[in-house]
């Protein structure tokens, strides 16, 4: 599982058909790819990592607070292209991405864990849809968080 985590002042995602929009203020915009072989263990780990990452400043301007500490929100957007491999040729291979049925289930699992276990306000994109994403980065602070399955 791969997540690109961005500290944001605001972020939104929209889909034209069917009409859909989700928006957050201060918090994290997370682009998430589920890889072949991923399971609930990776969903649990990455949700915990997203919730606990201390990338927001404290009173001394040190990165010492999590999204939960600042009462921020998470915009979680599926992005299978993060699992793309560009090692050969010029067209990426997405063979490393989970099949859509599994990818969607684990994407939803991460969202649900963030909401229930970590008590965060979570907005989501639409799995598998072509989306437009608007992000106002803060910092910028962008991290790649990855949990590989064992085996």
Where are these regions (language model features)?
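An anionic oxygen-ligand recognition environment, strongly enriched in 2H phosphoesterase
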Residues: 96
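N-terminal, polar/charged subdomain of small-to-medium soluble alpha/beta proteins
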Residues: 1-93, 105-151
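Active-site-adjacent loop/tail segments of enzyme domains
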Residues: 100
